[in-house]
Amino acid sequence: MLDAQQETYVEKISFILLNQPIAQCNASYNGLAHLKSQIRRFVNSQEKIKLLLPAFPCKTNNLDKVLSHTPDLGEYVVLRKFVQCIRDIESVYEPGVTFYIFSDYHTFSDYISVDLDHHYDYSDNLRKMVANMNCSDALKIVNFEHFDEFSDLKDTEYFDGLREKFGDPDYAENFTELKLKNNKMNQTYLGLKKFMNQDQKFVLAPLSYKDRRRRLADIAKGMMVQGKALDNFLQQKFADCIRLSIHEHPMIGKKYSLFLFHERQFKTPWHSTLLFDASRGEFIIDSKENHLKRSGVILPVTHDGKPWCYLQLSAADEVHAHALRQIRAELQHEKSGLYLECPVNRASLDMLLPKELSQLVKEFGSVLLRGFAPLADAEQLQTWYLNHRSAVTWAYEVNVQAFKGSTGEQPLHWELSCPPAYMAVHPHRYQYEDYTPHEYAVYSVASPDSNTWTVVDAALAVLTINGQEREQLRNTIMHYSNFSPEHGGNTLHPLVRYCSTSRQDVLRWQDFQHAQGYLTHLEGVSELTEQSRIYQRLNTLCHDPRVCFEYRLQTGDLLLVNNLTTLQASHTSSMHNEYWSIHLQPDSINSPWQPHNRIVEQAELTSA
């Protein structure tokens, strides 16, 4: 019998699983009750919650569907979704989770025509993605090689070994008869034939129509026979796990179906390609072939020298479309730090729509534009960038700020964390979302020497830490004071906050401990040793190369930054370096720069 606190754990864990990964297809009360009973058993013994998902075999050999044989943004997005679920469960249940992904490549290897080396390359890169999210201890990618039952076999023998050790001979021998008496089984068989006909079309192409039909029948039957053997193996070796599935099943307490992507369809990254539609600000999951048929300009994006995803941009006419197609697109990290480089002709920035660029900034944290025609002056930057949007107004009604040499240097921070006193951003009137710019632009006017901008993926930084630590940081408040004569101001910020725009937790920290004109201290943390420990932890977290990277700005570069999901620092080695910056006003009706609020502020100043 669980006590009240333990029952609360059960309810919270159930909610997280149902709200995030589990699809709840044809859900029944018994399915929910069984899920809770499984969770209750783990909680009662203070064990880790155990989840099992057979999936992630390898990329299909069909290059009409995918970019290559290695994992790409599709796999990363799904794994990041799993890590988010793990962190959320950790935050409410201290023992945490072990999430097993059992690669089923060897189960079906004789039917999918994918090289063994490609499978290992795929799995190794998946593990690298998980390691970059610091979650290898909780999200484990395993295979037959990790079990004693297969220790006497070579990896090329796992396929036959599975059937021999865990198969159902009666099921295989009586397959045709069983199929004719079981409609669900027959539907699965027909569905597999149809799917594999399309998936293996290049392998099947040399065969005659009759031989192709015979081969598809063998493949469908063989995959179902192997699937039965895999089920038997998993039931023995992972009997205590909550069983997840990439296929649709009624939620009756046996297998819990997952939507791998946010789209509520049963799609997998190893059979599809991701495209980011900049006009809509969302990912489209489809085949590579279909993406390339879309309207607009389709740009391939690489990461670490590998094909990664596509971008779709709009073009005003065919001249602009031709110029846009020359752009080289590359991501610094798996899902952050986008380079768009125009290699020839110094094309005008006018061919890029600022609103589409803002969607890219929102999704990828920062975008660097390089190789485009230079801007003549600050007014041209303002006109192009704003595009009927409004800018933050600084002292003397300035929208574009100019910095030269060391005046542009800043430690790790986010913009307007501690607004100047002249902005009259009073905490009783304005919330964080009201006055924090969601985006800003930096134009490198002159950069004869190194002009470095460090960008921290503040959402990924939070994702790399245990859920318990995340909540401790959320409940830790940092007090920032700016006592410089031209600024002034005081603010309070939690070290972790939920960003409603990106729907994720982000780190909010500024390394102003030794910055001139600033004082910082942690609210409610009186011990200097504890304050020092927290500062050191934050410093280590933010400078982890898995979450931060550098842009080395050249003359003419334009850097667009998501101020809500990143932290930024700038450093220059020359007094001759110069840049301009302009910040978009927050999308809040209660922004301090809204006309009705400026009228109130003017009235208050007059009465004072």
Model-derived regions, located:
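Non-heme Fe(II) oxygenase catalytic core, chiefly the N-lobe of the double-stranded beta-helix
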Residues: 300-551, 565-591, 596-608
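N-terminal regions that are enriched for targeting/export leaders
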Residues: 2-79
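Short loop/turn segments at strand-loop or loop-helix junctions that form parts
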Residues: 45-64, 100-109, 141-149, 443-445, ...
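Histidine-anchored nucleotide/phosphate-binding helix
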Residues: 74-94, 354-357
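Hydrophobic beta-strand segments of well-ordered beta-sheets in folded domains
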Residues: 47-53, 92-105, 139, 232, ...
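A substrate-binding/cap region within the structured catalytic cores of diverse enzymes
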Residues: 105-265
